[in-house]
Amino acid sequence: MSHLHILSQQHHASSGIRVRVVSPDLPLRVFPFASDQVTAVVTTRHGGVSTGPYGSLNLGGHVGDGPEAVAENRRRLAAALGVDRLTIADQKHTATVAVVDGALAGRGHDGVADSAAAFPGTDAMITDLPDVALTILVADCAPVVLYDPVRRAAGVAHSGRVGTLKGVIPQTIKAMAATFGSAPADLLIGIGPAIGAASYEIGAAEAAEVMAAFGEAGTRLLTPTRPGRATFDLAAAIRRQLAAAAVPAGNVHDMAIDTRTGTDDFFSDRAARPCGRFAAIARLHRAADESPPRAGTSVLTRSPALTLLKSKPLRPA
């Protein structure tokens, strides 16, 4: 099994966290809580074979890039992570969470149809299986990684404006609690590169939706710019939801990288269309005394009721 080789460590002044850069051939930004127990990383746009607006590590199969290039890019990323296949959600801006068991591990890797068949209308995934590379694809929306070191469980969520207002992050936290017994106080959270507050201007109708979802607190997430327009602080909205879910602020690590102004390293749909997609990945590592699960099996057997969640999305309450 391959291991990520850390070449350097950079300090990101705006967030106060350290971002490690891994392998010059396929650079990955690593969340501070990544360890020998869990991989928690974000890709950049470098290290692949795509060209033009998709150059070069485009992982999205739905944006107009050649399928052969996307397949090779996914193969390269999987190899760098030490797995055979990525597990990729369908992503339709919902608050639906899928519990990934042995039957779902590695689904979505083969393209859009594979993702839609395995994870229809799903924007978050959770698992307690090792060696499952949960993968979310983004280009301005916030990729969020969740890790419970106590229960040894992990998750990823696609949290753009629509998904955030629908509550995809609170739903993912609830799903981890219901499925694995995860306590919010134990969760370590990584917010990857996303469109920054100053770059994300929305209209009056969208601003009204923010106010409806957050109430009076919504005024602190919106900054008027001109008549009928305001900027929206997506990352702050996610942090507010995490706080409301009882996740300690010290457990939240925001890379604070604006994709709209950081197009040298990341794709941004607002900056250029068409464009590719980069990824956030969470992958639990196998314990030294842990045997691989049999194909099609699940570890979700702590409670008979939880077995009903196998291979089925957990939908919002």
Regions inferred by a protein language model and the residue ranges of each:
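Active-site microenvironment for binding and transforming phosphate-containing groups
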Residues: 1-317
